[in-house]
Structure formats: structure tokens, C-alpha cells
Amino acid sequence: EKGTPGFSQGKGEEKHGIRASNTSPLTLDEVVVPADNLIGGVPGQGLKQANQVFGYTRLMVAAMALGAGEAALEIAIPYAQERIQFGGPLSDKLGYTHKLIVPHQVNMLAASAYLEEVALRIDSETRDLQVEGSIGKLFVTEAATRCADDCMQALGGYGYISEFEVEKIKRDVKITCIYEGTSEIQQSIIATFRWKVARKSKGAFYGAMAAEMEALAAQRGDLGAADLARAAKAMQLAFDFATAQRLTKQQYLMFTLADMTTALEVGMALSRKAAAAADREAAVLAAAARVFSANAAQLFARGLRTLAQGTRLVEAEAGESLLEAAGAAQLALAGAGTVADMDTIADALFGRTA
């Protein structure tokens, strides 16, 4: 409590963002804390108790980041429609829309789909969803940070001016990659626990994902589900390979595995949402699902190559066997029609007619 001997509060920090929130150091020098002040009821259980709520507290941080990314797009999109350059609005320039706007709209749609799914599961299930919370936080906060950066770029010099707000969004959203566990902590959690479940289930965990996406691809061939089915099968092989080659203590490689399964699981949520969509939203979500799944497949191809050939720890023959078994070459070829799909999304965003 304030006034406790040995406890002092420093002056407020000058921060990169969230400046309206006071942040100051707290110093405890030989502070005696009464037993009655114990939080949680049982000594030594603090981390375990915290882990029980991280599934939704990290999801809350991800939702904050999603709002920031969407807010940045809501500034950049009308600006692109109004700003005339080289004889027409910026919204007609594919180098502008397809680099600075559309990829982030795809990611925000994927983020929304994943967070909705996990939030509904938290409301209806009692089991721990810590890994899902970590996946949501890792993907959404990093995607929103990139989104805000490109939306600032999309406004040119105006993006650097406080009046247009994007620079503030860019400063504020960065904290979501840091507090409630940094992105690197999330990668460690995701890789470790997904590796454990891949081993414990003996392939059933990712096998079920592959089967679901294969069934969706058979029902609807236009949602990128076939790419995700291949990725799910490759994910199990990648974890098996990491175990066999004793790569699980190589932190960077575990981060690579975390990024792979994150892309897979977020992509599945977007494909499911696209399958359930109706009316005008359906075409845009289907296009976004195809773009996202193609990007995920290409990320898998790069990740598999990193595992197989990126270190001195793996024999060349073993690495080649992984790439062949996991279908890395086929995953790398994903992306047919991506530009046309981005056209569809841009048309909807900017109200363009074909």
C-alpha cells in the first residue's frame, strides 16, 4: 500500500505511445508484506493462476490491436479515394492499394475471424485456451503494427503529422506487441505447447485439422482450404522432424514453427468464416481466405526450408526428405489468382466498379 516503509514510486516515464496512461517505476526496498495481503490464496501458485487467465487477457490485448489496425485503415481508405495523383485517385493505383492497404485488410479480416472463434470458445468451454490466446496475440498485434505503419506511409507526408492521427495509432499499437507477454514469449509458448500436443496426439491433432480443411475444400473449392490442409499435414511432419533432429532447443527454429502453426490456425478460422458468409460479404471473405491461405502456404515453404537446410545441425539427406515428404515445393507454388483476388477486395473497399 502507499506509504508502506521501503515502497516508493518514481516519476512518470516519457513513453513512445499510450502517453495518456501513466507509467512509473515502483521500488521495493526491504518491504515487509503482511500475509493478509497475499493475492490468490495459495503461496507459490501465482504463475499457475496467471496462466489460467492468459487465454482471454491476451485475447483482449489482441482485440485492442485489431481495433487500432482497423482505425488506421479507416483513415487511409477515404484518403486514398480523395487524394488525386497522376491524373486519378490513389485508390485506382494498384501499386498503392495492393501494397499498402489490401494485404492489411486481409490480415484484419483473418484476425477478426480468429478472435471471434476463440472468444466464443472461451465463453462456452472450461478448459485452458492459453495457446489460442497466445496465437491471437502474436498474430493480431504484429499484423496491426505493420498495418498502422503502412497506413502512415499511405498518407505520405500527412501520415507524419499528428492531425491525421495515424502516427498516434502507430505509436500506441506497438505496446500490444510488448505487454501481456512479448511476441517472442508468445512464440515460445505456441511452439512448446503445439510441439507437445503434436507428439502426445501422435499426429491426431494436426491430422484433424487437415481432415477438416480437406472436407471444406471438397465442399467449397474457392476458400484456400486445400492449401491449409497441405499445411496442416506439413506441420505435423515439421514437429516430428524437429524432435528427431533435436532442434527443439534451437529457439529461432521453434519461433519458425510457432509462426507456421499460427498462420495455419488463423487461416482456418478465416476459411470457416468465409464458408459461413452470405450475400455481399461472401465474395470478399472468400477472396481474402484465398489470399491468406496462399501466403500461409508460402510461409510454410520457407519455414520448412529453414528447418531442413538453414542450420549445420541437419544432414542434407534428412533435410531433403523433409522437404519432399511435407510437399514444400507444392506449398511454394500457392498463390495462383492472388492479384485478381486482391482486385476483388480493393473494389469492395474503395467502391470501385469493374
What are these model-derived regions, one by one?
Residues 1, 29, 62-64, 93, ...:
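Generic beta-strand/beta-sheet core signal
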Residues 67, 102, 106-109, 138-145, ...:
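Generic structural signal for well-ordered, non-transmembrane alpha-helical segments
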Residues 39-60, 73-106, 116-133, 159-163, ...:
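Glycine-rich cofactor-pocket loops
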Residues 18, 124-214, 280, 284-354:
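Alpha-helix capping/hinge segments and adjacent helical runs
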Residues 1-66, 70, 85, 162, ...:
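FAD-binding core of flavoproteins
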